[in-house]
């Protein structure tokens, strides 16, 4: 009799499951979107001649970061007032690395605006005085 009960329970469980009818596969869990994140964003070089002259400003760039995490487009939105600084900012930002934004678990392109600040050092570096002396002497 014990053996009958042992086989009856699994059979009843199978019948109960079959009676429930077809169950639909559970919906795939929604994957939360993630935003773009900076990984490696070193500042551009600040030419010492411009820094010593007190030339500075803020360059604003429109940057499209592709699914692979690198800038695919870089455009000037607002000039610092110094063409050389604007160009240096654009060149350096093209080298930056990001963790791409994701939608439904897949990396996607995203466009952001990036301000790049150039602030003259205070106090002036000693190198500035040497540059000024050379300029006074005509070379």
What do these predicted ranges mean?
Residues 16-19:
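C-terminal motif of bacterial Sec signal peptides marking the signal peptidase cleavage site
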Residues 76-77, 113:
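Residue-level structural signal for beta-strand termini and adjacent loop
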Residues 78-83:
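A short acidic/small-residue loop/turn micro-motif
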């Amino acid at each position: 009799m014990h053996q009958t009960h042992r086989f009856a329970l699994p059979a009843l469980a199978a019948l109960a499951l079959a009676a429930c009818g077809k169950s639909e596969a559970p919906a795939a869990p929604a994957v939360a979107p993630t935003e773009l994140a900076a990984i490696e964003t070193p500042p551009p070089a600040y030419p010492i001649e411009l820094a010593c002259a007190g030339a500075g400003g803020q360059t604003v760039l429109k940057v499209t970061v592709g699914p692979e995490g690198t800038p695919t487009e870089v455009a000037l939105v607002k000039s610092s007032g110094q063409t050389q600084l604007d160009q240096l900012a654009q060149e350096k930002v093209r080298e930056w690395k990001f963790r791409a934004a994701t939608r439904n678990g897949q990396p996607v392109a995203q466009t952001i605006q990036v301000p790049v600040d150039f602030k003259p050092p205070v106090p002036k570096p000693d190198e500035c005085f040497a540059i000024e002396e050379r300029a006074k002497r005509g070379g």
